[in-house]
Amino acid sequence: MTSSSSKSNKSRKSSKAAKDTTPVHESASRPLSKTPPPFRNHIVDKRGLKQLVAWAYKNHGTAVTSSMADKLKDLGFRYATQAAVSISVNDLQVPEAKKALLGEAEEQITATEERYRLGEITEVERHTKVIDTWTETNERLVDAVKKNFNQNAPLNSVWMMANSGARGNMSQVRQLVGMRGLMANPQGEIIDLPIRTNFREGLTVTEYVISSYGARKGLVDTALRTADSGYLTRRLVDVAQDVIVREDDCGTTRHIVVEAEDGRFGNRLVGRLTASQVVSAVGEVLAERDTEIDPPLSKRIEKAGVTAVSVRSPLTCEANRSVCRKCYGWALAHNELVDLGEAVGIIAAQSIGEPGTQLTMRTFHTGGVSTAETGVVRSVVAGTIEFSAKARVRPYRTPHGVNAQQAEVDFNLSIKPVGKGKTQKIEITNGSLLFVENGQTIDADVTVAQIAAGAVKKSVEKATKDVICDLAGQVRYEEAIQPREVTDRQGNITLKAQRLGRMWVLAGDVYNLPPNAQPVVQGDTEVTEGQVLAEASQRSEYGGDVRLRDSIGDSREVQIVTTAMTLKDFKLLEESTHSGEIWNLEAKDGTRYRLNTIPGSKIGSGEVVAELADDRFRTGTGGLVKFAPGLAIKKARSAKNGYEVNKGGTLLWIPQETHEINKDISLLMITDGQWIEAGTEVVKDIFSQTAGVVTVTQKNDILREIIVRSGDFHLSSDSKALERFEGDGHMVNPGEEIAKGLSIQDMKYVQTVETPEGKGLLLRPVEEYTIPNEAQLPELSHVKQANGPHLGIKATQRLAFKDNELIKSVEGVELLKTQLILETFDTTPQMTVDVEKAPDKRAKTISRLRLVILESILVRRDTMSDSSHGSTHTELQVEDGISVKAGDVIATTQILCKQAGVAQLPEATEADPVRRLLVERPEDTTTLSTSGKPVVAVGQRIVDGELLAEGDPSSCCGEVEAVDSNSVTLRLGRPYMVSPDSVLHVRDGDLVQRGDGLALLVFERQKTGDIVQGLPRIEELLEARRPRESAVLCKKPGTVEIKQGDDDESLTVTVIEADDAIGEYPILLGRNVMVSDGQQVTAGELLTDGPINPHELLECFFEDLRSRKPLMDAAQEAIANLQHRLVTEVQNVYKSQGVSIDDKHIEVIVRQMTSKVRVEDAGDTTLLPGELIELRQVEDTNQAMAITGGAPAEFTPVLLGITKASLNTDSFISAASFQETTRVLTEAAIEGKSDWLRGLKENVIIGRLIPAGTGFSGFEEELQKEAGPHPDILSEDPAGYRRMQNLRPDYTVEMPPAASSTAVLDDPSDADLEATRTRHNIDPSASNFAAFARPDADNELKEEQVVDAEAVEGLQEEGLLSDD
């Protein structure tokens, strides 16, 4: 009932007070509690109010509480009005301390930036430190705000509002009067520029923009959260809807243990029933089994020093498909034992789902892990540090880049004071950080150590960050880095740093050379401004005639004609039509070719240049193609371009006209089989082109097509002939007799057709087309270079159709095309051919077609210099129209020096030529004069502040180039720290430009607990999701041994188990081992860091217990372990967000998730292997097997997520209404399932009364037990009587009337019984008592039967009882 809103001491005091503060008004109704309310005088804040109302409700009922709440409201408004509490801008007081705090933070950050500049810390360490600094400053500022209000204006309205819990909280007040703090960018990374101002002072433009990122995120977050939370509730309700309290006591002895946290139970025991005696430390019995624990008893148990209490819980309840009252405990609505028929499942689901909207309000994390979790210890005295004898430490570098030591064991550290005084002792725990050495002398108030808070196993993740170069120059490694090459499985080689070390970039002007440029200067030579540093030339590949084109953009194109071919015998003519230009080639004999491309375009090899314009092979209509013997075509891969003719011959063509129609049959104007003349209208608006016999194809009253076959029609009765030409028909040669008295002069195609007049033969005309063996080729002349690609043209004939192909068409088609096709040999596929129009050499008016292959070379323009390129100068070495040979230089480009200096070249290798060169300019070096003799040597690298000579610190970083008696010359540079295992992108001696990536730092950052927290985390737990990279879990208990793998990266953890068996666990790269050599581990313990896979955990528990215990016990215990874990995890998420939910709600849901087992081996039972079934059912089945001696079923417990559990419920109606409706219903139908309508959902869907509350079926039975048989027994009721719904408890009639008219109220005679038996077909072996008497609750206790006068009277009136 309580909620923790403010943690200040004052509210604690007031809450104590508020528990019994109730000045209840006299006029209120009679109090339920006998104790008079005590009087307390205290500040009441939100928490106090909550407790006050709760107290009133508990002790005095609803009415009193509501009237009291009303009075409190009036009180509040009245005094708020009198006090004139309002808010104005002046109430937002910014604390004085803010300036100083920000100044301090700035100083720390400047120092950090300086350390980064000097290469003492890596980029990651700098970022972490900056973020942590700001986070800490923000925290301190909040304290300053609190302090300021508390001391100077405790009645400030903003402060009162936030502090009392009325509205708002400190984090919001902080933004009003403190500072807005760090913000995340849209990717969720923290921007290391915090918003220093608050809303009172106003934000700068930059801050405003940064700030609005966060605001938008909040809005989107809220919208999404509502949807997610609703869906979560729906799934929860679905999984738990059939959990109803169905019995009073299941009688189980199983229980769960609730342990005290810091000696306190809080509210965790209240409302539970004890599972066994609770005995205090001194042996006093505090509570017997099944005692309800109320707050006073809970307090007494706490006071008696009891640390663990075993209580009954829904998790261990053995009621079938439900929970019993005693295991559930109090219904939290009215703090009394839960009623029968209460739908606790739905209440649980809503209790967990509803706060979902409050979760993840504060999703993003404020930055690096705050160091507040670990306690910093400072020295009290000045003295000498001494470690105790067993101390073991190893060097450690903190996330802020401070070198320290980490303790490997627990030990004591003492500081012995220099003079008199007490020795300071500090207990150092394993994992703590020490900032001092053994034997070191320190001053007072120095940070000595950071004590690790317990064995906090934080999960870490690998993250990477790029190191970007800030200046151009040459890379130099320090010795310390020790780079090594690592080859991965794909054979890629990466360079990795092995140790922490610096990488230097020494300044210089770096020139990027264009491709194929060669340096023309030597290394270490002086160069002047404008001098040529490198030269690149562009050469022709094949040679040929040069054409210079006008420049396009920033480059000029030089074209070299390598091959050209002119079609000499053809004139190129241009015709204009309304659809555009058409180009034709005309031969001397007047044949024309249509050009498929237009001059100025490009074509590739194998494409058609032109087609013969020829009407000889054009048909009048569609028809049937037949090849005469001898005509052959090439097989083509696709018929898109037709089939090439291999060998000429004759092609036969049988014309037929086909109209494709697809219209309604009512539009048909002729009949099937009719002979029509040319020009007949066959369908509305469609006319036949030829005369002939019509065939109509239709389907479902839709006209598909109409075919007109021309020819001569002869009615014939010659059945042999008709049969011969049935179907497709065939060719008949001239002079052959077709039927009696019918022979032909020309070749015909004969077919049998049916017409309205009768059957007959249709003699269809055949057209012959002669196809030459090969197409004639026009004369070509072409020029070919000595080694250029070859060009040619070949003429081919292509048939558009295969043998026997039917062409459905009304217009004619082109049967044969003669095409000119371009051929190029020995070429690259990318090569294209340009089509050009060229004037004839002799007659200038005539144009010819010319095909050329061009080599195109783009020549760069001159460019001015920029930061990474020198200025370039390009000269053409050729003129228009001259001829060049292959390999001749067309143009040269020179790279010119920007500024005088000394040129340096990196070493070139075969594999990689020189791509960059460096010029060391005068401003890249500096000479520092020293007062004394320098103490540095040439080649040494120096950072700011290092001494050059006695008393002369250096003012810049760099490498010593020369040393004189009183001066030092430095080449300026910049150090970058790289951490171990970083990937190095550059090698020693490489040249880099500003902005290049130098390395990829690999670092571990602690997973911020809130990446997966709030709703997603709850969902992850309840859906029992398998995490992507889960931790390695130990399967059996034993002792750990850690072995190094073959390569230095891989590890194997072996666990030596009790029976000397050895379990091996290979550890993947990048995983941190959480155990140490020789440590004892238990089953299910983490061997590496990472999220836990709950399924794997259950398996570990079960496997381990299975070896020591019977199957059933092992399953129950493994499930119990997992249940406990799940409940705790879910609670942790809600607690971290300040939401309090009673454990029992979570337990009800977890119970549903863990209620099933998977059958592995069915034994002699009727179960199926692999089937999911309730643990209880298997238990019952196996007990039956034990009695009959059959083999029991083997099974393993399973954990189902809420969605899975909902779909696996016994009721298919409920499952189908949840998700995957079709699948669930189909399966149920195939398996022939029955739904027993046990849950609420099934009943609601079908429209029955739900079995909860007053519809709870247990109540019917109770009533029936009390009421006995109903007197209005219908004579046709076969088994004696029917129990009616409207049972009236005032009837006490025991016996049904006898067969005769006289009713006998004592035991009936045998004859009567016999008669009744025969009348009702009752088996004579059934006992008389069972058949006729109402079974009592207890047969031994016979009730005294009193005749009820009214009842007898009623029976007599109805003629069921004689008057005597």
UniProtKB/Swiss-Prot annotation:
Keyword Zinc assigned: yes
Sample GO molecular function, one term: DNA binding
E.C. no: 2.7.7.6
Gene3D superfamilies: 1.10.132.30, 1.10.150.390, 1.10.1790.20, 2.40.50.100, RNA polymerase Rpb1, domain 3
One record GO biological process: DNA-templated transcription
Annotated keywords: DNA-directed RNA polymerase, Metal-binding, Nucleotidyltransferase, Transcription, Transferase, Zinc
Assembly: In cyanobacteria the RNAP catalytic core is composed of 2 alpha, 1 beta, 1 beta', 1 gamma and 1 omega subunit. When a sigma factor is associated with the core the holoenzyme is formed, which can initiate transcription.
Protein name in UniProt: DNA-directed RNA polymerase subunit beta'
